[in-house]
């Protein structure tokens, strides 16, 4: 089952309608996601594990976690190109040179799970890949 707990906080998050979600997996995985309301039922994820991001769910999105090493971006782009998936925007975030990094890619087409798996396996420095469809 799933255990869910809600806590109200007085912490100033820079916006009146912010949610901070901490999720723990049964095998020790942990992620912290911060999002805010944009109004009209729309939301934006603004932070994942300390990385500032902008994910609204209004575009197909591929998210990677990887080490900041040469060739990672090229391999991800190569795998998407092989599948004829066009990149509309791409942003990279890193904690430091050669350190942990996140890449957010918006695409014109959905990224199927099999393609996301190919992306993950395309370079040893890629540690995690998640494909999100439009919501």
Which residue ranges define each predicted feature?
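A conserved regulatory-domain signal marking ACT and ACT-like small-molecule sensing domains
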Residues: 1-135
């Amino acid at each position: 089952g799933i255990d869910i707990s809600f806590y109200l906080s007085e912490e100033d998050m820079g916006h009146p309608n912010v949610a901070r979600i901490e999720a723990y997996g049964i095998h020790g995985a942990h992620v912290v996601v911060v999002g805010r309301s944009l109004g009209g039922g729309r939301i934006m994820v603004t932070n994942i594990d300390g990385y500032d991001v902008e994910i609204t769910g209004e575009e197909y999105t591929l998210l990677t976690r990887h080490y900041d090493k040469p060739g990672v971006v090229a391999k991800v782009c190569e795998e998407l190109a092989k599948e004829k998936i066009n990149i509309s925007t791409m942003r990279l975030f890193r904690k430091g040179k050669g350190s942990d990094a996140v890449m957010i890619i918006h695409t014109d087409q959905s990224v199927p799970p099999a393609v996301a798996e190919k992306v993950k396996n395309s370079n040893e420095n890629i540690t995690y890949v998640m494909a999100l469809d439009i919501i």
